[in-house]
């Protein structure tokens, strides 16, 4: 399931923890590329911008030609990717109309080249070449995540829409009257904190509704974005963009969808048990007027804006004898650990495993704290900005246990990125998206009481009798997430295939959330709402 990462190589939005990966590169590269024609990619790879697949496949291709093509494609895409990565970093950490436009232009140059490369790679189908070259040809054909149609106008529109949608999400705020009667503007972090800490259902409902209102204006741009992506995917030979996405896992797209359902069926009984238990405990806390005895749980009561992780409600649902013996958030604050030192803890974790320290530039260029003077995309992400060693993270860190774990997860991406930075450019990624997230989550699972004692954050390791609390917390975060990750992809696939029409966008979203998560919105929703886009990975 590719929820945690909007894309892979050719969207250049991979591994941003997004988490996302991005790279950038030589400063002179971006300036030089500014002068390239918008369809430079097609010319670089030696094919006319509008030639057909039939024209390109007149004569059989040789192994030598295939290798020469992939070698050249890698060099050109590397430069274009680095230029886009740098521009996208600036846009994500300083959202303005100008930075969105610059990032969109750089993205378009890269996308044009990637589309041209994908089409040219298809002309080598059936060629007898070495395994490495064949793998590169496959990656060139399927690695696009935002397939733009051929033609400078529509290609430019795709990248502009992508930048604008992300900007709308990053700048989203809910305006309400504060306790003093004055208007106050709350961003996602502040609204999420209300859901994480408040125990007032009305206050939580207002925060939930407030954030979801920011997604309404996105629908028109989203519709056009889907239309153009589908057109681009069909030009590459896929039914739709969803089929393109599902083709990346070394199995047929339909087989991948069936495999995901098969795996979910294995986990579903455990999730249903957790859901029933949590619903019962919340009903005991809030009463039958707020939480039903049977049926879905109201989405605003689970401690997270999207009800994707439930760890923040652990104090409400844990058995009385399940106290883990420590409060990590409290301990961080007692020891006056600031945001930067939290990242230092993460770096020392990896150094204890034998890895080299992060580069000096990591500390100079990363975004650790939300700036007060500009808009940024706070969504936690790990970046490899030059596809080499310019590693960074982008987070609006809060001093709490959740962000302490997230930092370790994000650094897992960074150290993985550095581990493969000597590979050919097309191989500078995980074998598929799942590996990147698996590494991040495996590292996060290592944040145990034993580790916390070793680094001095707790004084003594709790006895084994306290494990139930720790295991429950893990289930609330990890098991609870699985159906959400699945349904986000199911939703996007259905939109791309046309199974879900624009008139059904919101109903389809809540139908899937009921089916997989067993949750419902806290108040009446309509097709004027676009609640799915209140989640970064949809917007």
Language model region names:
Residues 54-224, 242, 535-539:
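N-terminal helix-rich structural modules
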Residues 17-30:
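Short, Lys/Arg-enriched N-terminal segments with co-localized hydrophobic residues
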Residues 183-190, 224-394, 461-474, 480:
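Active-site-proximal, well-structured secondary-structure segments within enzyme catalytic domains
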Residues 256, 260-270, 430-463:
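Post-HExxH zinc-binding segment in Zn-dependent metallohydrolases
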Residues 37-48:
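Bacterial N-terminal signal peptides
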Residues 449-538:
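Long, amphipathic alpha-helical stalk/connector segments used for oligomerization, subunit docking
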Residues 402-418, 437-441:
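Active-site recognition of the HExxH zinc-binding catalytic motif
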Residues 337, 391-408:
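Short pre-active-site segment immediately N-terminal to the catalytic Zn-binding motif
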């Amino acid at each position: 399931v590719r929820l945690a990462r909007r894309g892979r190589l050719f969207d250049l939005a991979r591994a941003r923890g997004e988490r996302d990966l991005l790279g950038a590169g030589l400063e002179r590269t971006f300036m030089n590329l500014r002068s390239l024609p918008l369809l430079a990619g097609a010319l670089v790879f030696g094919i006319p911008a509008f030639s057909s697949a039939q024209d390109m496949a007149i004569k059989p291709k040789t192994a030598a030609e295939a290798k020469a093509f992939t070698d050249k494609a890698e060099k050109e895409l590397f430069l274009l990717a680095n230029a886009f990565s740098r521009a996208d970093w600036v846009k994500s950490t300083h959202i303005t109309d100008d930075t969105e436009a610059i990032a969109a232009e750089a993205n378009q140059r890269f996308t044009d080249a990637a589309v041209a490369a994908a089409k040219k790679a298809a002309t080598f189908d059936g060629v007898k070449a070495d395994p490495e070259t064949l793998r590169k040809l496959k990656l060139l054909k399927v690695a696009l995540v935002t397939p733009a149609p051929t033609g400078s106008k529509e290609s430019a529109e795709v990248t502009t829409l992508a930048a604008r949608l992300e900007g709308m999400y990053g700048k989203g705020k809910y305006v309400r009257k504060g306790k003093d009667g004055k208007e106050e503007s709350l961003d996602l972090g502040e609204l999420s904190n209300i859901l994480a800490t408040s125990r007032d259902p009305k206050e939580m409902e207002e925060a939930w509704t407030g954030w979801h209102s920011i997604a309404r204006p996105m629908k028109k741009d989203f519709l056009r974005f889907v239309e153009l992506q589908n057109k681009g995917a069909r030009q590459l030979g896929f039914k739709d963009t969803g089929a393109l996405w599902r083709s990346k896992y070394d199995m047929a797209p339909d087989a991948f969808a069936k495999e995901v359902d098969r795996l979910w069926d294995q986990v579903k009984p455990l999730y249903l048990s957790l859901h029933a238990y949590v619903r019962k405990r919340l009903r005991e806390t809030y009463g039958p007027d707020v939480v039903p005895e049977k049926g879905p749980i109201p989405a605003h009561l689970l401690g997270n804006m999207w009800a994707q992780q439930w760890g923040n409600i652990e104090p409400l649902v844990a058995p009385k004898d399940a106290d883990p013996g420590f409060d990590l958030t409290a301990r961080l604050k007692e020891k006056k650990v600031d945001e930067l030192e939290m990242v230092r803890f993460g770096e020392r974790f990896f150094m204890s495993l034998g890895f080299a320290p992060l580069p000096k530039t990591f500390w100079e260029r990363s975004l650790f704290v939300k700036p007060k003077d500009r808009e940024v995309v706070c969504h936690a992400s790990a970046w490899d900005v030059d596809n080499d060693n310019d590693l960074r993270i982008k987070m609006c860190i809060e001093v709490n246990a959740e962000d302490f774990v997230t930092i370790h997860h994000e650094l897992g991406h960074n150290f993985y990125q550095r581990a493969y930075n000597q590979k050919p450019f097309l191989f500078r990624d995980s074998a598929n998206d799942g590996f990147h997230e698996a590494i991040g989550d495996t590292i996060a699972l290592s944040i145990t009481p034993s580790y916390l004692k070793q680094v001095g954050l707790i004084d003594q390791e709790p006895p084994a009798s306290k494990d139930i609390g720790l295991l429950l917390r893990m289930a609330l975060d990890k098991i609870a997430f699985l159906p959400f990750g699945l349904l986000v992809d199911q939703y996007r696939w259905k939109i791309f295939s046309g199974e879900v029409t624009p008139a059904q966008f919101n109903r389809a979203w809540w139908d899937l959330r009921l089916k997989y998560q067993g949750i419902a919105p806290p108040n009446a929703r309509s097709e004027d709402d676009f609640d799915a886009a209140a989640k970064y990975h949809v917007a």
